Curated annotation (Swiss-Prot):
Pfam entry (one): dUTPase
Presence of the UniProt keyword Metal-binding in the record: yes
Requisite cofactors: Mg(2+)
Matching SUPFAM superfamilies: dUTPase-like
Name of the protein: Deoxyuridine 5'-triphosphate nucleotidohydrolase
Protein EC: 3.6.1.23
Function: This enzyme is involved in nucleotide metabolism: it produces dUMP, the immediate precursor of thymidine nucleotides and it decreases the intracellular concentration of dUTP so that uracil cannot be incorporated into DNA.
Keywords assigned: Hydrolase, Magnesium, Metal-binding, Nucleotide metabolism
Gene from which the chain derives: dut
CDD domains for the chain: trimeric_dUTPase
Keyword Metal-binding in record: yes
Length: 151
């Protein structure tokens, strides 16, 4: 298992709020918790930034982290990420903040310590552009959205 440096920024982490862990041996994502002093109520359509109390430094440029919504919160309550997906670059060292958006119909209260997002680590390839006049022909060509049909 790859080791990622983590710094605890809020003393309640590990005392009141556990460090992120994988829920099962097959889990892809680590659950991130709301490191809040008080509950935060999100009205429909509202967004807020929620601290995690943690900073990570991936250091390896062949890796990045992605923050994703938790499926139950999104499906049952309309709570998703305000930026849809959060990308954490390998050289970022600041606090992990979660942009939370209530796209649901009802207000939702985020409780201190509540699991509100998940983080996965993904491989990264840094590519360099090769300037060309034309591309080699493919079956698809320039076919865009809906090109392959629905059936």
């Amino acid at each position: 298992m790859k080791k990622i440096d983590v710094k605890i920024l809020d003393p309640r982490v590990r005392k009141e709020f556990p460090l992120p862990t994988y829920a099962t041996s097959g889990s892809a994502g680590l659950d991130l918790r709301a490191c809040l002093d008080d509950a935060v109520e999100l009205a429909p359509g509202d967004t807020t930034l929620v601290p995690t109390g943690l900073a990570i430094h991936i250091a390896d440029p062949s890796l990045a982290a992605m923050m994703l919504p938790r499926s139950g919160l999104g499906h049952k309550h309309g709570i998703v990420l305000g930026n849809l997906v959060g990308l954490i670059d390998s050289d970022y060292q600041g606090q992990l903040m979660i942009s939370v958006w209530n796209r649901g119909q009802d207000s939702f209260t985020i409780q201190p310590g509540e699991r509100i997002a998940q983080m996965i680590f993904v491989p990264v390839v840094q590519a360099e552009f090769n300037l060309v006049e034309d591309f080699d022909a493919t079956d698809r060509g320039e076919g865009g959205f809906g090109h392959s049909g629905r059936q």
